[in-house]
């Protein structure tokens, strides 16, 4: 009828971002998520610092997620974090590249081999003949960037002109 009012009720997605917001990546990720939310439907987003996970463990993060009724979490997780606890509680888990990639869950990642190759190409075009790479120990993005950097320089004949420093953990 003409006087019928239609109500559309939707559930607002509640997302926790467990990331280091002192880094540009986390801010850009948040900006992209909020832009997507504006174009589709409103989301509620909780910014959670990694210190919270350090203090309370995954169990503490899960407890907060339960109180807040989170639907999903994007986070910097360690290999030994029991992330399956989120899944068991109906919370979707997405890993932000941090130390390594996860096999069982979705990862936010990049083509780090290509990034390293692009850096090496840049220095080769500038005429450099000796190269150094400053990276971090046991960080997938750093390891793969170095591998792309190294491969490109080896293909150009500079396999003996590369110094790698990766003694500092994140």
Residue ranges and their predicted role:
Residues 79:
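Short glycine-rich anion-binding loops that position phosphate/pyrophosphate groups of nucleotides
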Residues 1-72, 82-170:
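Bacterial carbohydrate/catabolite-sensing allosteric modules
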Residues 75:
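Redox-cofactor binding/interface segments in oxidoreductases and associated redox assembly factors
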